């Protein structure tokens, strides 16, 4: 595999082409952003940690029957992945009230929800990734109802697998967001699963072990990511 020119640079990753039209190299950066890019910073070694965490979690999910874009970890910062066409939606899965949902609905952070909540947001930086519903997504041509049904099914499988896995590591999976890509007529889990994209709380202490530490200036951000890596890597 030969790495080629950069195809795209996002907030947390760079995507490079390869000599195979169906694969890309994903490079994990140390850059950190919050509030749709309004807050910017750097977390030392974040890219290294998130690459490792995502690689291990994607391998776990593959074993549990969730198809992903992940092929292999190349080095400490890079993965080889299938070149998917990203559906311009984020699927957000919430097990416990926190973050924007708690604020929006006037719920106390940490409240256990009576059922898992699934939301979608439109991936559009100019619009600050607004929450939309299924009908919006279909009406403006982002997806179909059939595809959405499959996306929610993937999200549910990911949630069930990771909730159980993290619980065994003494971690509560509060919520997370995923992206999904089209590849060869299939939908694949894409992007990453890491403390950048999940809320993860210590089961005993309630300590936040995710990007909320950066968002809220809580300190010890690198240490929190390292703790997640340590537990995932048990």
Swiss-Prot record:
Q: Which CDD domains match?
A: SAICAR_synt_PurC
Q: Name one Pfam family in it.
A: SAICAR_synt
Q: Which reaction equation describes what this protein catalyses?
A: 5-amino-1-(5-phospho-D-ribosyl)imidazole-4-carboxylate + L-aspartate + ATP = (2S)-2-[5-amino-1-(5-phospho-beta-D-ribosyl)imidazole-4-carboxamido]succinate + ADP + phosphate + 2 H(+)
GO terms classed as biological process: 'de novo' IMP biosynthetic process; cobalamin biosynthetic process
Question: What are the alphabetically sorted keywords of the record?
Answer: ATP-binding, Ligase, Nucleotide-binding, Purine biosynthesis
Q: Molecular function (GO) terms listed?
A: ATP binding; phosphoribosylaminoimidazolesuccinocarboxamide synthase activity
**Does the record bear Nucleotide-binding in its keywords?**
yes
- Pathway membership of this protein? Purine metabolism; IMP biosynthesis via de novo pathway; 5-amino-1-(5-phospho-D-ribosyl)imidazole-4-carboxamide from 5-amino-1-(5-phospho-D-ribosyl)imidazole-4-carboxylate: step 1/2
* EC number(s) recorded for this UniProt protein: 6.3.2.6
Group of enzyme by EC: ligase
- Identify its protein family: Belongs to the SAICAR synthetase family.
* UniProt name for this protein: Phosphoribosylaminoimidazole-succinocarboxamide synthase
């Amino acid at each position: 595999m030969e790495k080629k020119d950069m195809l795209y640079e996002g907030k947390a990753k760079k995507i490079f082409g390869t000599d195979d039209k169906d694969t890309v190299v994903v490079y994990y950066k140390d850059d950190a952003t919050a509030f749709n890019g309004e807050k910017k910073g750097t977390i030392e070694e974040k890219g290294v940690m998130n690459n490792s965490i995502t690689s291990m979690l994607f391998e776990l999910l593959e074993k549990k029957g969730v198809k992903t874009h992940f092929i292999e970890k190349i080095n400490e910062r890079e993965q080889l992945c299938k070149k998917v066409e990203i559906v311009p939606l984020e699927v957000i899965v919430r097990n416990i009230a926190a973050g924007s949902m708690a604020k929006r609905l006037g719920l106390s952070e940490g409240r256990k929800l009576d059922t898992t909540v699934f939301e979608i947001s439109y991936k559009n930086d100019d619009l600050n990734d607004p929450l939309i519903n299924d009908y919006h997504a279909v009406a403006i041509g982002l997806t179909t109802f059939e595809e959405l049904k499959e996306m929610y099914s993937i999200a549910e499988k990911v949630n069930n697998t990771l909730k159980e896995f993290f619980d065994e590591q003494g971690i509560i999976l509060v919520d997370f967001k995923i992206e999904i890509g089209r590849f060869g007529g299939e939908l694949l889990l894409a992007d990453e699963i890491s403390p950048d994209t999940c809320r993860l709380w210590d089961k005993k202490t309630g300590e936040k072990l995710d990007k909320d530490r950066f968002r809220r200036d809580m300190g010890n951000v690198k240490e929190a990511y390292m703790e997640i890596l340590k537990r995932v890597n048990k």
